[in-house]
């Protein structure tokens, strides 16, 4: 299943033990034209901060962000970039000095929207 694939990828890419992940929901599937990937994002929970081991070929680094920081409007920014010789505004998150953009930013934007509407 897609959920099992998400758990497997989490284990393979950042080393989180499959047995400690509890899936609590899923987000909207999305297509990424640049990579031709279809992504089915899931939200997982662990009782404690999990041990991670980064797969260097897949992930640059792992860092933690509080839910409170994620939902702050000031952490969602835009910058100008060029795509196919056109200037475009690219949204990104600035989280504890880390820039999160692209597909990860799109997924986090939906998660942030859900969290803000739970209050």
Regions found by a protein language model. Name each.
Residues 1-100, 109, 113-119:
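Unchanged
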């Amino acid at each position: 299943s897609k959920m099992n694939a998400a758990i497997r990828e989490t284990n393979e890419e950042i080393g989180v033990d499959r047995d400690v992940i509890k899936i609590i929901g899923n987000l909207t599937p999305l297509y990424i034209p640049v990579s031709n990937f279809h992504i089915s994002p899931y939200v997982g929970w662990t009782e404690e901060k999990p041990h991670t081991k980064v797969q260097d070929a897949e992930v640059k680094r792992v860092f933690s962000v509080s839910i409170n920081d994620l939902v702050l409007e000031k952490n969602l920014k835009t910058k100008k970039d060029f795509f196919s010789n056109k200037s475009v505004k690219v949204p990104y998150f600035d989280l504890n000095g880390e820039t999160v953009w692209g597909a990860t930013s799109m997924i986090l934007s939906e998660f942030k929207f859900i969290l803000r509407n739970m209050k």
